[in-house]
Design a protein with these regions (language model features):
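Solvent-exposed soluble domains appended to multi-pass membrane proteins
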Residues: 2-436
Length: 436
């Protein structure tokens, strides 16, 4: 079932699409800077010039990056056990590459890792990609390797070379470029370039002379290393956009960037970020009036990832703004589909411009989030995010919706319902409409 037409319907119809799958990029990176230097200056610039969805979540399960791909492309949720990519790659999916292929697009995916990682070799065929470029299609050397494979700079550079050939052959194309460098454990600090995550201050001595004093702050911590890694990856995004522009590949093209999931770093690691005492190089005592509590709810709500839709001519238009309604990775296909002129009648997510502030983000563990409430299904308790009163009826209704959505999505994948003459269509539609 597709959402209603709205002012965004078909606005990007016929445009080429570049999707950037941003490994472990979180939204909170975008508000951080050290010594006046932003962690993600390029992401920030694209967000400022494009459509920035700032309340966006990627409710992945054990399939992490592959779960993000599943949700982004199919508007289904992760399976309850195992992963769709590994266990259910032979199923039928109404995926964006397949649906755009039916509209005459050439579709491809690019990733510098092994083709068998998360079984992408098989799953990308099921999603409808015409071509999957993987590690063997790239010139990978010891020098250009970071972490799991080719670094993002070399990957993007070689990918643009391939894209130039694709663009010459095909009038319309849709491609996903999957980043790799900003992958846990964020330990190759010597390769990330110079980005200190300390505090530098100029102090005036009694004799009037000045000197620069450095406090370690996040240096030597796993979270600090994550910031360095993310800054490195952000630089690669900046170079990619520049190169695409130089090659004329941004004409009639939209760029979609999303963070695939949060960095999965423990909550305790954030304590130093928010409660650092530079005088003692330690964490403030909980009794200190300046101590900031970072509880489990703040941690969960802080796991949001960026979603940016950008084109070189979008700045200053009506589209160029921040969109703040809660949104999930499985809402992207119906939202993007409405803009590009295709639809998946079995999408479990919604076009965010249709559902607006009535949206619900459902997580694989049964937790859910609206603009007003974050509900923890394990503890059976909620955090109210606004002054709006919360009723038991609303909690019950949303719990039923979350449970139904997870069940229906799981059944669609496991029992291959999109192939089996779609006899479960009514169940799908019922789940879609319950929380709408």
């Amino acid at each position: 079932i597709r959402d209603r037409d709205n002012k965004y319907t078909n606005i990007f119809e016929g445009k080429n699409v570049i999707v950037i799958h941003g490994e472990s990029l979180q939204t909170n990176l975008m508000s951080l800077s050290f010594n006046g230097e932003e962690v993600t200056p390029n992401l920030n610039k694209l967000a400022e010039e494009g459509m920035f969805f700032s309340n966006f979540y990627s409710p992945v399960s054990v399939g992490t990056s592959s779960d993000a791909e599943l949700m982004f492309n199919t508007s289904l949720l992760p399976t309850k056990s195992g992963t769709a990519f590994v266990s259910y790659s032979d199923r039928t999916y109404n995926a964006t590459p397949k649906l755009l292929g039916e509209k005459g697009y050439y579709t491809f995916s690019m990733h510098g890792n092994n083709a068998d990682f998360w079984n992408r070799r098989n799953m990308h065929k099921s999603l409808g990609y015409d071509r999957f470029y993987s590690k063997t299609d790239y010139n990978v050397t010891e020098e250009n390797t970071v972490g799991l494979g080719i670094n993002d700079y070399a990957f993007f550079d070689q990918s643009v070379d391939k894209l130039k050939k694709i663009a010459k052959k095909h009038d319309k194309w849709y491609g996903m470029m999957m980043m790799l460098s900003n992958h846990t454990p964020f330990s190759e600090v010597d390769k990330y370039g110079d980005f200190p995550v300390d505090i530098k201050e100029t102090v005036t001595n009694e004799d009037g002379t000045t000197e620069e004093v450095t406090y370690p702050y996040m240096e030597g911590t796993k979270l600090g290393n994550y910031f360095k890694s993310a800054h490195y990856a952000d630089g690669a995004i900046g170079e990619l956009i520049e190169r695409l522009d130089e090659e004329g590949l941004l004409e009639n093209t939209i760029v979609v960037i999303y963070g695939d999931h949060d960095a999965r770093l423990p909550r305790a690691d954030y304590n130093r970020l928010y409660n650092y005492d530079k005088e003692t190089d330690s964490i403030l005592d909980k009794d200190d009036p300046n101590y900031k509590e970072y509880d489990s709810y703040q941690y969960e709500l802080g796991r949001k990832v960026p979603l940016i839709i950008w084109s070189k001519d979008m700045k200053g238009t009506d589209l160029n703004k921040e969109y703040t309604n809660v949104m999930s990775m499985y809402d992207v296909e119906p939202t993007l589909g409405n803009m590009l002129g295709y639809s998946n009648e079995y999408a479990l997510g919604h076009d965010i411009f249709d559902i607006k502030d009535q949206n619900i983000v459902v997580f694989p563990n049964g937790n859910w989030l609206t603009n007003d409430i974050y509900y923890n299904s394990q503890k059976e308790e909620y955090l109210s995010l606004t002054d709006k009163p919360v009723t038991e009826e609303e909690i019950k209704k949303n719990n039923e919706y979350a449970s139904s959505l997870l069940d229906v999505s799981n059944d669609i994948i496991i029992f291959d319902l999109l192939k089996k003459d779609q006899t479960d269509e009514n169940k799908v539609i019922e789940a879609q409409e319950k929380g709408a």
